Amino acid sequence: MLDLKLIRQEPDFIKEKLATRGVDPADIDALLELDAKRRELIVKSETMKAQRNTVSDEISQLKRNKEDADDKIKEMRQVSADIKDIDAQLDTLKDQVQDAAAHLPNIPNDNVPVGLTEDGSVELRQWGEKPNMDFTPKAHYEIGEDLGILDFEAGAKVSGSRYLYYLGAGARLERAVYNFFLDENTKAGFKEVLPPYIVNDDSMYGTGQFPKFKEDVYQLKDEAMTLIPTAEVPLVNYYRDEVIPEEELPVWFTALTPAFRSEAGSAGRDTRGLIRLHQFNKVEMVKFCKPENSWAELEALTKHAESLLQKLGLAYHVITLTTSDMSFTAAMTHDLEVWFPEQQTYREISSCSNTTDFQARRAHIQYRDENGKLQYVHALNGSGLAVGRAVAAILENYQNADGSVTIPDVLVPYMGGLTKITK
């Protein structure tokens, strides 16, 4: 949520910055018009309430003097009726202002590349050697099916498209990957959390999924409850409507959860394999910190996510997304994209974002500074990492000509000493 006071004071700045994210300046004008009407009615309501108090005092005085107060009583009833009408209008306007503001994305940082598409993202760095194979690499889903460790056909039979079964060494590899991620995250100072997988609408609003992105998630019928699209939702909302003691900042959380996504608008994209599923495991990282530290925290978050890929020996690059390609809540996003030999391209495996005070305003998460003044924290989030995509990257990058897959060294202890998956 943007600061409404800032929008009032610097409308041209807001229009210019949000235009780079595809926001029509007319939307800002419409919000300001609603806000002006609301503020005007607030003044009118307060004036009439003061008038009602004055008339009430006059009625009391007339009654004490045993004088006729009928006219004043009629006047007060009319004023009270007018106040009730104005307050009803105010309630409506408040909701309209809130809704209009809730649809505006975060202000992009000045260092974010401007672009209305993903084209224009800036590569920051590359790491690792892409595997040099003397055979034609297979896609991860072909490898998994040939080894009997991934069963997409059974997933489609039981649940539909974009679901699967992990079997045998495949299930163990998935478990090895997320346990490795969690162990590395906790070693780095993150507190492990096991959160709820179903959250209420206030939580979805707090992290910015609602009201704009309801079509992207699975909601429970006849209940204001949603299956989480990411652990970011329950982790950020842990502190919703709370004041974090200053001495506890920064707070670092990590969690493994399933993520449930409808993938609305993704028809025809990545229809095979582990890249785009309706249900997948993801290890998430969330940080809360003071505003002055959030950009350093973003770099540290990104570097830590990179370290996971480095320990797995997977080649990747880091890019800064354009203004329109980064998430709705982000002021800046660094994507980590891992190399897929069969596709001969990089694919996203982590997004690390600084949401500044955007989520904190929506979720009312504050801390009290050294002067005793309440301030909004800055919240950051990043995948650490997407588990299924990591499994896919391992299958493709560690495949052998005979169809087997070598286990990365760091995962061998998690695989019970298994060094290779074979038929």
Swiss-Prot record:
Chemical reaction(s) catalysed: tRNA(Ser) + L-serine + ATP = L-seryl-tRNA(Ser) + AMP + diphosphate + H(+); tRNA(Sec) + L-serine + ATP = L-seryl-tRNA(Sec) + AMP + diphosphate + H(+)
Sequence positions that bind L-serine: 230-232, 284, 383
Cellular localization per UniProt: Cytoplasm
Source taxon at top rank: Bacteria
Comment block on domains: Consists of two distinct domains, a catalytic core and a N-terminal extension that is involved in tRNA binding.
Family note: Belongs to the class-II aminoacyl-tRNA synthetase family. Type-1 seryl-tRNA synthetase subfamily.
Protein's recorded name: Serine--tRNA ligase
HAMAP family found in the cross-reference section: Ser_tRNA_synth_type1 (MF_00176)
UniProt cross-references to PROSITE patterns, sorted A to Z: AA_TRNA_LIGASE_II
Pathways per UniProt: Aminoacyl-tRNA biosynthesis; selenocysteinyl-tRNA(Sec) biosynthesis; L-seryl-tRNA(Sec) from L-serine and tRNA(Sec): step 1/1
EC number: 6.1.1.11
Transmembrane parts of this sequence: none
